[in-house]
Curated annotation (Swiss-Prot):
UniProt EC number: 6.1.1.23
Matches recorded under PROSITE patterns: AA_TRNA_LIGASE_II (PS50862)
The organism of origin for this protein: Rhodopseudomonas palustris (strain HaA2)
The protein's name in its UniProt record: Aspartate--tRNA(Asp/Asn) ligase
Role this protein plays: Aspartyl-tRNA synthetase with relaxed tRNA specificity since it is able to aspartylate not only its cognate tRNA(Asp) but also tRNA(Asn). Reaction proceeds in two steps: L-aspartate is first activated by ATP to form Asp-AMP and then transferred to the acceptor end of tRNA(Asp/Asn).
Quaternary structure (record): Homodimer.
Residues the entry annotates as binding ATP: 221-223, 484, 536-539
C-alpha cells in the first residue's frame, strides 16, 4: 500500500465498497454524533466522510483530532446508512470506517476558519493566505484561472500562434507608469527595469522574422493603488502579428476571446459578432470608453431642444459653442419618487442635481423642465428618445469633456435602479479610433493618449499636417460588461514616423534613440507592418469567476498599500547588500 494514499478524497464511489483504502488530507470538519465521530477529510480533489465508533481501534486517536490537522486514515469503504446520502458530493454515497489514523501534521489555533465562507478582514486573509487558499471558493477560482490560461494557450495555437518568452530584466522606458527599478551590481549607478509590458520585445520579434507571437506575460507597474488593478504585477495574454491590418487582428482574436468566454460562461450568452464602436461615439452614447452593453440605455445629444428655450439655465449654457445637453432615457422610471431619488443620488456625487422630465398618460410631460420648455419641445424630446407614458428622461449639461464621466455613471445608475441590466450575459465589443494624443493639463503639453507605438491614421501626413488633437490612431480596446479587458493597435513601423510621433509629445530625436535604441535600429533594417494586442488575464478570470475583486482570483496578492503581508515584502535588506550595489539610503523624514 502507498505510504500516504491509495485514493484521493474525491475518488471513492459505490464500486469501492468493501475495499480497504488509505486516504490523506486535512480534517475539514469534525462532528460528534452521540458517540460516533465523523471526520470530513479534504484534499485538493474533494471530500470523504470518515467514521469512527467506540469499538474502532482508532477511536481514541480520532478524539484527539482538530480542524485542519493533516492525517492519514486507513479503513474500509462502506455504504452510508439509508437516508444519509449527500448528493452534493461525488463521494456522498459512501464513507470510510476508520481502522487506523496517523497524524502527519498537527495545526495550531486557526486565525481564520477554512470550513465555511465567512468574511474575514483582508489583512488576516492575506497574512494567512495559505489557509485562505484552502477555502473552497478561492481554491476553485485559482483552479479556474489555470484552466482559463490553458484554454487561451490552446486557442492561440489553433490560430497559428507560437509562444515565446521575452526578458524580465530590461531597460526603463516611458510607457505611462513608473517602472520597478533593479540596480545593477556590475554596472554601478545603472538600473534595469521590470517590464511594464513586453511591448518593444514583441515588436522586435516581428522585425526578427517571426510571425504570430504570444505569451502569458507578467507585467510590472509601480502604480498607486487602484480598485480595479492589483498593485505591482499582473498578467496579460500578449499578442503580435506581422503583415496585418486592424481587421486581421480582429479576425484572429475574436474567436480566441469568444471561445474562452464560452468555455467558462456556465451557459451565459456570449456575444458572437462583436460591434465596433468608435471612441467618441462610445463616450457620447455610454459616457465611457468601456461601455457595458448589457445596459440598453443610450444617451443622446438633445441640445437643439433646449437652445433658446424657457429653461434659462440650459439655454444660457448653450450660448457657448462647446456646451451641450445630453439625455439619459429612463424607461419605466416616470414616477416622482424615482426622479427625486435620482436627483438626490446626483447631489451625493457632488453634482448640483439631475434634471428630469416624466411622461404621464397621454404622453404629457411633467416636472420643472417640462414646465419651462413647453409641451412642443417636451414632445420632441420624447419622440427623439423613443419614450412613452410612464417613462422619464434625465439631463446633464455643460462641457461634455467635464460631465461625460458623470453622465456615464448616471446611465449606469438608471439602468441598475430600473433593473434594465441583464447580468446573465457577457457583452463583448471593440472600441476603435482612439485619439492619438491628448492635452495634459498638469504639464500643459500634448501627450500620448494611449500606446505611443501606435500607427496614426493617415500616417506621416497626419503627423505633419493635422492638429495633433484631431489625429486618430489605429488603436483599439476590447470591452466586456463595463471593463476594458484588452488593448492593442497597429504599430508605427517607420523610423521617421516614430521620431515625429514622439516629437509631437515633446521628445527630441536623440531622446527617442536613447530610450528606444534597439527598436529604432531595427526600424532601419526592414521592419514589416505589424500589430497586436494584450488581454488582461486577471480581469478576464475575474469576470468568468463572477467576482468583483481581483484578489479573489490571485494566488498571493499584495494589499492596497502594495505590501505582501505573507512574505513581509517590501523589506529592509542587509547593509552589505546595499554596499554591493553602491546604494546609500536617503529616506524621507517621518
Amino acid at each position: 500500500m502507498h505510504r500516504y494514499r491509495t485514493h484521493t478524497c474525491g475518488a471513492l464511489r459505490d464500486s469501492d465498497i468493501d475495499q480497504t483504502v488509505r486516504v490523506s488530507g486535512w480534517c475539514h470538519r469534525i462532528r460528534d454524533h452521540g458517540g460516533l465521530l465523523f471526520i470530513d477529510l479534504r484534499d485538493h480533489y474533494g471530500l470523504t466522510q470518515c467514521v469512527a465508533d467506540p469499538d474502532s481501534p482508532a477511536f481514541k486517536d480520532a478524539e484527539k483530532l482538530r480542524a485542519e490537522w493533516v492525517v492519514r486514515i486507513d479503513g474500509r469503504v462502506r455504504r452510508r446508512p439509508e437516508g444519509t446520502d449527500n448528493d452534493d458530493l461525488p463521494t456522498g454515497k459512501v464513507e470510510i470506517f476508520i481502522t487506523e489514523i496517523e497524524v502527519l501534521g498537527p495545526a495550531g489555533e486557526l486565525p481564520l476558519p477554512v470550513f465555511g465562507e465567512q468574511d474575514y478582514p483582508e489583512d488576516v486573509r492575506l497574512r494567512y493566505r495559505f489557509l485562505d487558499l484552502r477555502r473552497e471558493k478561492l481554491h476553485q477560482n485559482i483552479m479556474t484561472r489555470g484552466a482559463i490560461v490553458d484554454a487561451m494557450r490552446k486557442r492561440m495555437k489553433e490560430q497559428g500562434f507560437f509562444e515565446f518568452q521575452t526578458p524580465i530584466l530590461t531597460a526603463s522606458s516611458p510607457e505611462g507608469a513608473r517602472d520597478f527599478l533593479v540596480p545593477s551590481r556590475i554596472h554601478p549607478g545603472k538600473f534595469y527595469a521590470l517590464p511594464q509590458a513586453p511591448q518593444q520585445y514583441k515588436q522586435l520579434l516581428m522585425m526578427s522574422g517571426f510571425d504570430r507571437y504570444f505569451q502569458i506575460a507578467p507585467c510590472f507597474r509601480d502604480e498607486d493603488p487602484r480598485a480595479d488593478r492589483l498593485p505591482g504585477e499582473f498578467y496579460q495574454l500578449d499578442v503580435e502579428m506581422s503583415f496585418v491590418t486592424q481587421d486581421d487582428v480582429f479576425a484572429a482574436m475574436e474567436p480566441v476571446i469568444t471561445g474562452v468566454f464560452e468555455d467558462f460562461a456556465k451557459g451565459k450568452p456570449v456575444t458572437k459578432s462583436w460591434p465596433r464602436i468608435p471612441y467618441f461615439e462610445s463616450l457620447r452614447k455610454y459616457g465611457t470608453d468601456k461601455p457595458d452593453l448589457r445596459n440598453p440605455l443610450e444617451m443622446q445629444d438633445v441640445s437643439e431642444h433646449f437652445r433658446g428655450s424657457g429653461f434659462k439655465v440650459f439655454a444660457r449654457m448653450l450660448e457657448e459653442e462647446r456646451n451641450q445637453v445630453w439625455a439619459i432615457p429612463g424607461p419605466g422610471g416616470g414616477s416622482r419618487a424615482f426622479c427625486d431619488r435620482m436627483n438626490s443620488w446626483a447631489q451625493g456625487e457632488g453634482q448640483p442635481g439631475l434634471g428630469y422630465i416624466m411622461w404621464r398618460e397621454g404622453n404629457e410631460g411633467a416636472g420643472p423642465l417640462a414646465n419651462n420648455i413647453g409641451p412642443e419641445r417636451t414632445e420632441a424630446i420624447r419622440v427623439a428618445l423613443g419614450l412613452k407614458a410612464g417613462d422619464a428622461a434625465f439631463f446633464v449639461a455643460g462641457d461634455p469633456a467635464k460631465f461625460v464621466k458623470f453622465a456615464g455613471l448616471a446611465r449606469t445608475k438608471v439602468g441598475e435602479e430600473l433593473n434594465l441590466i441583464d447580468k446573465d450575459q457577457f457583452a463583448l465589443a471593440w472600441v476603435v479610433d482612439f485619439p492619438m494624443y491628448e492635452y495634459n493639463e498638469d504639464d500643459k503639453k500634448v501627450d500620448f493618449s494611449h500606446n505611443p507605438f501606435s500607427m496614426p491614421q493617415g500616417g506621416m501626413d497626419a503627423l505633419t499636417s493635422q492638429d495633433p488633437l484631431t489625429i486618430k490612431a489605429f488603436q483599439y480596446d476590447i470591452t466586456c460588461n463595463g471593463y476594458e479587458i484588452a488593448s492593442g493597435g497597429i504599430r508605427n513601423h517607420r523610423p521617421e514616423a516614430m521620431v515625429k510621433a514622439f516629437e509631437i509629445a515633446g521628445y527630441g530625436e536623440q531622446e527617442v534613440i536613447d530610450r528606444f535604441g534597439g527598436m529604432y535600429r531595427a526600424f532601419q533594417y526592414g521592419a514589416p507592418p505589424h500589430g497586436g494586442m494584450a488581454a488582461g488575464v486577471d480581469r478576464i478570470v475575474m469576470l468568468l469567476c463572477g467576482t468583483n475583486n481581483l484578489r479573489e482570483i490571485s494566488l498571493f496578492p499584495m494589499n492596497q498599500r502594495a505590501e505582501d503581508l505573507l512574505m513581509g515584502a517590501p523589506s529592509q535588506v542587509a547593509p552589505k547588500q546595499l554596499r554591493e550595489l553602491h546604494i546609500r539610503l536617503n529616506l524621507p523624514e517621518s
